[in-house]
Amino acid sequence: MEGIILGIESTAHTFSFGRVSTTGELFPSFSSLYRPEEGGIHPREAADHHSETTSTLLERLSDSEDFSWDSIVAVAFSQGPGLGPCLRVGASVARTLSTRLSVPLLGVNHCVAHIEVGRNQTGCKAPVLLYVSGGNTQVIARADGRYRVLGETLDIGIGNMLD
């Protein structure tokens, strides 16, 4: 069945609603970034930000020309890795939307989602990939539709180091 999968990203400082068709077409996303006054991310404050911006982001999504709630066939959400309080907000919003729309709820690994979007957009077929994003730096192998982490940083991810 062709339709749209609504994705919810809430692993850390960004809260987003994104869309992808069941045929792989990407649509513009709607995001809000938590910016602490100083220092790094404060997980509870970031989660509060996500809760406070949910309505605004959903309104922006609803008002976009190419969007219809009737086209949603599933709701996907980042279930980890990420910051616990932030992940809980995303999961709660996803469960609510899934229930209201009577569509399946799909928990997604945040790292795998990054990789799969990249593979979808580039046609990459390489069996071994280097994944670098925020707090995650991993060497990952893909075989038979599954991923296996071959190695990863133990102290700090390259993305965090660069931040």
Where are these regions (language model features)?
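Short acidic/glycine-rich loops and adjacent helix/strand connectors
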Residues: M1-D163
